Amino acid sequence: MNIKIVCVGKLKEKYFKDGIAEYVKRMSRFAKVKIVQVPDEKAPEKLSPAEMEQVKEIEGKRILDKIKDKEYVYVTAIKGKERTSEAFAKELSDLTTYGHSDITFVIGGSLGTSDAVNKRADDLISFGKFTMPHQLMRLVLIEQIYRAFMINSGSPYHK
């Protein structure tokens, strides 16, 4: 299985980098994991709704350029479907059973994802109604992917 995580912006904090690297290392026995960062669009603090959409569109084009047609795509979104860890693990298992070996997860920038990115998604996934920094979301997402692999392998990691 190939897991790709497409994220907007660079990760600067060492503690996030270290945590993500640890989970990527742990997952190497289950999947090849690739993290792709696309540049975030610089924008002033106060934006009009139209300017916000423009920023999301620019970042969205950068995201879509990194996604291939054959990839199954999850986009993280507050309005996405919430799942339990067990249900998510079953979904990943079912995807591979039905021939999806390339799975991509998208984490948008601070304003979210564009309509075009959301339309490209095969599924919108939510980790709750809380707003999180997108840097933290990377770590949360990768831990949940790892947890799914551990659930599917019968490991006691998930209690």
Swiss-Prot record:
Gene Ontology cellular component list: cytoplasm
CDD domains assigned: RlmH-like (cd18081)
EC number per UniProt: 2.1.1.177
Keyword S-adenosyl-L-methionine in annotation: yes
Ligand binding (S-adenosyl-L-methionine): 108
Main localization category: cytoplasm
The reaction(s) this protein catalyses: pseudouridine(1915) in 23S rRNA + S-adenosyl-L-methionine = N(3)-methylpseudouridine(1915) in 23S rRNA + S-adenosyl-L-homocysteine + H(+)
Pfam families assigned to the protein according to its UniProt record, in alphabetical order: SPOUT_MTase
Domain of life: Bacteria
Keywords: Cytoplasm, Methyltransferase, rRNA processing, S-adenosyl-L-methionine, Transferase
UniProt subcellular location: Cytoplasm
Molecular-function GO term, any one: rRNA (pseudouridine-N3-)-methyltransferase activity
Gene3D superfamilies linked: 3.40.1280.10
Keyword DNA damage included in the entry's annotation: no
Top EC class, one word: transferase
InterPro entries registered for this protein in UniProt: Alpha/beta_knot_MTases (IPR029028), RlmH-like (IPR003742), tRNA_m1G_MTases_N (IPR029026)
Role summary: Specifically methylates the pseudouridine at position 1915 (m3Psi1915) in 23S rRNA.
Annotated family: Belongs to the RNA methyltransferase RlmH family.
Subunit details: Homodimer.
Name of this protein: Ribosomal RNA large subunit methyltransferase H
Species for this entry: Lactobacillus johnsonii (strain CNCM I-12250 / La1 / NCC 533)
Gene from which this protein is expressed: rlmH
